[in-house]
A protein has these predicted regions:
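Bacterial N-terminal signal peptides that target proteins for export
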Residues: 1-7
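Bacterial N-terminal signal peptides
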Residues: 7-16
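His/Glu-rich zincin catalytic helix
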Residues: 19-91, 113-116, 125-128, 199-304, ...
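M16 family metallopeptidases and their MPP-like homologs
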Residues: 42, 47-60, 69-73, 87-132, ...
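Short, conserved secondary-structure transition motifs
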Residues: 150-156, 247-260, 369-378
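Generic recognition of flexible, low-complexity loop/linker segments
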Residues: 199-202, 257-258, 316-319, 405-406, ...
């Protein structure tokens, strides 16, 4: 009994500590330069490292339909160097300084970041300012990166099982909005584009007023502000209005169904439901619902479809974080001998349960606990804090959401989950994709 009492006491103490960590405020300073660049500084001396990042408010949705893939191409192209930096030296310089770097592109934004020892902060600011205003964009760089992007497409999409999944969903779920193409775009358009088109895209979107610079970690705020002004203060505004897509996706009124054949061994079923943008309060409920269905061994899809019925080899569900109305996807890869129709029926049964019935108190508390755990995990390191600060400013214009968003999850009730599931997870609001082996295609 004493051992049990001790265990309970220890658990309570750990839970209390976790609760304090979850609610610990993340401090930051933010301001604008005269050229429109928004700057966010987060001071954290727990480790002698710093993360510098720039998020540009440009993604694949900003592209011309006849020039898809531009934003992703620029993710690569802007590592080519600059007027004051040798070609291909960007990565070498950061790695020589003991740092790491990367970049990624979504439908809504492009994100560059590097984490270095804190005594190398000034170096990263110089390099990001070079990327913003002095990038080397010429025929040599274009040809180099065309080859790189084509190879990436082969590896990640063409030669990967189910690699075309997102492309198929985007192309069929959307008819009007530019989410209808994926960030990788089409190699044909990148090949056809002229140097002048790339220069115009760069001068339009990779400008101070379309970016947020975030620096987090072991920094001296006063010194950092001086360096920010030194390297970014002299960069001029872009000089023209930044175009934003205005297309609105029509409301879907009937279920869509698509068969797609690829080099896979087992059929897969994808259910893609239209959902509101991440700014909408219902989006938080949708995140919790996808977590309920697929996150962990005790999730509903896992227990029912994989463990009990053995109809699926793998299952999953997630909602894309989109600035505009997007999709929440549920997928399953069928076990050998299981038809896609049977797998779809099993998935539908679990979806209908959350539409018609409130979840248990135990499940609900587990969802909230997981949201809190995810929040702590994302903000344990400077890189995670920096990414979140950039995201909250870019899409919400509310940087302090990093301290308040958790309350949005906590405010979702069991009734909200049932209501939101019933509203969005209807058959008329979805696309069903059967991702099938080529051997099943009728000749």
């Amino acid at each position: 009994m004493k051992l049990k009492a001790l265990s309970i006491a220890v658990f309570a103490m750990l839970a209390s500590a976790a609760s304090q960590a979850q609610t610990a405020k993340i401090n930051f300073t933010e301001y604008d330069l005269p050229n429109g660049l928004h700057v966010i500084l987060h001071e954290d001396h727990s480790t002698p490292i710093v993360t510098t990042a720039v998020m540009y408010h440009v993604g694949s949705k900003n592209e011309d339909p006849q020039r898809t893939g531009f934003a992703h191409f620029f993710e690569h192209l802007l590592f080519e160097g600059s007027d004051n930096m040798g070609r291909g030296e960007y990565m070498k310089i950061i790695q020589a300084a003991g740092g790491q770097l990367n970049a990624n592109t979504s439908q809504d934004r492009t994100y560059y970041y590097q984490t270095v020892p804190s005594n190398q902060l000034e170096l990263t600011l110089w390099m990001e300012s070079e990327r913003m205003h002095y990038a080397k964009i010429d025929t040599i760089g274009l040809e180099t990166q065309r080859k790189v992007v084509k190879e990436e497409k082969k590896q990640r999409y063409d030669n990967t099982p189910y690699g075309q999944l997102l492309n198929v969903v985007f192309e069929n779920a959307f008819t009007t909005h530019p989410y209808r193409w994926s960030p990788i775009g089409k190699a044909q358009y990148i090949d056809e584009a002229k140097l002048s088109e790339f220069m115009d895209f760069y001068r339009t979107f990779y400008v101070p007023e379309n970016a947020v610079l975030v620096i987090g970690g072991d920094i001296n705020v006063a010194q950092t502000k001086e360096w920010v002004n030194k390297y970014f203060g002299g960069i001029p505004k872009g000089g023209k209005a930044i175009p934003r897509p205005t297309e609105v996706e029509p409301v879907q009124t009937a279920e869509k169904r698509v068969n797609f054949y690829d080099n896979v061994q087992l059929p897969a079923v994808i259910l893609a439901y239209h959902v509101p943008p991440m700014k909408d309060n219902d989006y938080y409920a949708i995140q919790l619902l996808t977590q309920l269905l697929s996150q962990g061994k005790s999730s509903r899809f896992q227990k029912a479809i994989v463990d009990q019925q053995e109809k699926a080899l793998a299952v999953g569900a997630f909602a894309l974080q989109n600035e505009d109305p997007g999709v929440a996807m549920m997928f399953g890869i069928a076990n050998s001998g299981v038809s896609p129709q049977d797998l779809e029926t099993a998935m539908d049964a679990e979806v209908e349960k959350v539409m018609k019935n409130e979840i248990s108190d135990e499940e609900y508390q587990k969802l909230i606990n997981q949201a809190e755990s995810d929040f702590v995990s994302q903000n344990q390191r400077s890189a995670g804090v920096v990414n979140n600060l950039a995201t909250y400013y870019t899409f919400f214009k509310n940087t302090n959401l990093i301290n308040t968003e958790l309350e949005k999850y906590r405010s979702i009730t069991k009734a909200d989950l049932k209501r939101v599931a019933a509203k969005y997870f209807t058959k008329n609001n979805r696309l069903v994709v059967y991702y099938l082996p080529k051997s099943m295609e009728k000749k």
